[in-house]
A protein has these predicted regions:
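Short, conserved DNA-binding cores of transcription-related domains
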Residues: 43-45
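Basic nucleic-acid-binding interfaces
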Residues: 2-38, 47-75
């Protein structure tokens, strides 16, 4: 979990420089699992809450995707 905390801090301080793989690790730690992929977009589902989030697979991720993830995990 320490690596996840470091990634969350990086997301807060530098939201424009995140890679999709890093965000996927954070989502996985909070109960999100890959639901499906269609083209360049991956959908992650939280089975406990039913929340569905879409992340575009581009490098680096746009700030809006990172901020959305932070809001959904409660950071």
């Amino acid at each position: 979990m320490p690596n996840i905390k470091k990634l969350i801090e990086k997301m807060k301080q530098q939201p424009n420089g995140m890679r999709p793989e890093e965000v996927e690790k954070v989502l996985g730690a909070y109960g999100y699992v890959p639901a499906r992929q269609k083209g360049s977009h991956k959908h992650y589902l939280n089975k406990e809450t039913g929340d569905l989030i879409t992340i575009k697979q581009e490098r680096p991720l746009k700030r809006a995707y990172v901020v959305d993830v932070l809001n959904r995990i409660g950071e």
